[in-house]
Amino acid sequence: MDVMAEPAADCVVKKSLRLSAPHGGRPRLLLAEDCDPVRIVTAAMLKGMGCDVEAVVHGEEAVRSASENEFDVIVLDIEMPIMDGITAARSIRSMGGPAAATPLMALSAFLADSVRTGEWRDTFDIALPKPANRNELHEAVKAALQRQRVEA
């Protein structure tokens, strides 16, 4: 007896969640998140979307990495030790060069309405509450990448 199985739904989803950078290659993302499980899971989701991810644990490391490397999107947790995401974002914006123009995404479990409504629009381009599922993360990063294409 022949049995034909239909493709697994997640195979279709994974294919549709592929991202590409404005330059046509794999998007390069910087992820700053102090919580190990969240950092590991978020990085894995981003890698599954075709992104190259550099993950750091606090804002100071994010600022240093942004000054030394070029990224297509920088994702910053708001509440981190040593340097919080807001301070890191403002430092990145003020450093000039390619980093200053890189789309910044706020990621926080305590995301205030002021972030979502644009009160920090001069600092962050996109705000995403945690926990974010794969589809929400994909849409936010996709929007950030498209924003970069428009401004480039």
Q: Model-derived features: where do they sit?
A:
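Receiver (REC) domain active-site loop signature in two-component systems and cognate sites
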Residues: 80-83, 92
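Hydrophobic/aromatic residues positioned on beta-strands within the core alpha/beta folds
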Residues: 105-107
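Alpha4 helix (beta4-alpha4-beta5 surface) of REC/receiver domains from two-component response regulators
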Residues: 87, 110-130, 135, 139
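Conserved acidic carboxylate
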Residues: 33
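C-terminal catalytic ATP-binding subdomain
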Residues: 1-19, 142
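Helix N-cap/capping motif at the beta->alpha junctions
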Residues: 55-64, 85
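Active-site beta3 strand of CheY-like receiver
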Residues: 70-75
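Charged docking surfaces used in two-component/phosphorelay signaling
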Residues: 40-48
